[in-house]
């Protein structure tokens, strides 16, 4: 089996407090609650002006190519509260970059760390990846804590162009290799 077959087999994932599942168009209102608040996505993309814009983003960037993209749902309410996805997946090198966001009122509860740890485990055990990385803005302390708690190590700091503002920014590159995972 290749990576895509394995990802298809794990389109639904359950953790202690979360469901990870493919996005649905019905998630648009929950997605809008996240995307319309600039505090939720300060480091991801600009706040969205209205539900129609959110529906466009949801359909074109989260639903259109569903493999390796999960809606994070709270088990208690079954509401979509965030996303976790392989931003960049290199099938040849067997490596991927994880990207994620979570609604602000769910921050600080260990939920994103729980989701990342589950994907780390699946990435090395089932998807046969050799390395994972997480890239954060230097100012994004919350995402850095998630990366470290999930076992990633700081690999380097670098400058890069922000994909939305086109301004040069400082980033941290965290890495976790298959060998590090099994230590």
Labelled PLM ranges:
Residues 59-71:
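A short helix-loop-beta-strand connector motif used in the catalytic cores of GNAT acetyltransferases and
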Residues 39-59:
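Conserved GNAT-fold acetyl-CoA-binding loop/helix
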Residues 1-42, 69-183:
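Acyl-donor (CoA/ACP) binding surface of acyl/acetyltransferases
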């Amino acid at each position: 089996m290749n990576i895509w077959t394995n990802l298809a087999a794990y389109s639904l994932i359950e953790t202690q407090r979360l469901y990870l599942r493919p996005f649905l168009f019905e998630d648009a209102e929950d997605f809008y609650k996240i995307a319309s608040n600039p505090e939720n996505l300060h480091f991801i993309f600009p706040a969205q002006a209205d539900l129609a814009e959110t529906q466009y983003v949801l359909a074109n960037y989260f639903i259109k190519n569903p493999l390796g993209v999960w809606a994070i749902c709270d088990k208690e309410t079954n509401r979509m509260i965030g996303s976790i996805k392989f931003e960049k997946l290199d099938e040849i090198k067997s490596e991927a970059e994880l990207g994620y966001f979570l609604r602000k009122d769910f921050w600080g509860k260990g939920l994103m760390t729980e989701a990342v740890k589950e994907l780390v485990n699946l990435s090395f055990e089932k998807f046969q990846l050799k390395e994972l990385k997480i890239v954060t803005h230097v100012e994004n302390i919350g995402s850095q804590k998630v990366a470290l708690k999930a076992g990633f190590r700081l690999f380097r700091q670098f400058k890069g162009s922000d994909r939305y503002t086109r301004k040069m920014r400082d980033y941290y590159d965290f890495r976790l290799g298959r060998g590090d995972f099994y230590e």
